[in-house]
Amino acid sequence: AVDFVIAEPNDWAVNKIQQIEGELLQPETVLPRFSKHVTGFERDLPLSELLGTIARKRYSQFPLYNKGKFEALITLRVIGFWLAKESQKGTIDLTRKKAADLIFKDGKYTNYRFVSASTYIFEVEEMFREQGTLEAILITKDGNPNGNLLGIIRPRDIYHQVEKD
């Protein structure tokens, strides 16, 4: 039968097809969606002061700088690992510890990447899929680690959006 219909278009399906078409023709870039103020700290900041700020402001990830030059991304996981290592030496004394003490140079992996403001969101999704240890993607104008931070993307920022769709 020529008039046999295999599917009836409905508003949801039509809207979804139009959304997909829009994403293919004009992929969304990381900015403005992931634009946000990112607080960073200098490596010589006393660790007790840094931990106090984390507790007060509930930061979970933040960049560490050496005189304005990016050095590392510190996360709660990194702090937990550092505390576990330090506890093996006995009582943990924070009096002379600096933020820089949290930086591990074991060369195992990098938990961050930098991207430019013009990076497509689908590229960021791919980065998170391909690098399971990635905890954050930091956004600068041109992807330069020492550039002004314009935003940060965590895996949950991407995947919460996917769940909403």
Language-model features, listed with the residues they occupy:
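Charge-enriched, short contiguous segments at helix-coil
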Residues: 1-25
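Short N-terminal micro-motifs specific to bacterial/archaeal maturation
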Residues: 4, 38-41, 70, 112-115, ...
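Short, well-ordered alpha-helical segments
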Residues: 11-15, 48, 147
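Tandem CBS (Bateman) regulatory domains
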Residues: 20-37, 75-134, 152-165
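Conserved small-residue-rich
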Residues: 31-85
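A structural micro-motif recognizing beta-strand termini
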Residues: 42-46, 58, 116-120, 130, ...
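A glycine-centered beta-loop-beta connector
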Residues: 54, 62-79, 128-132, 137-157
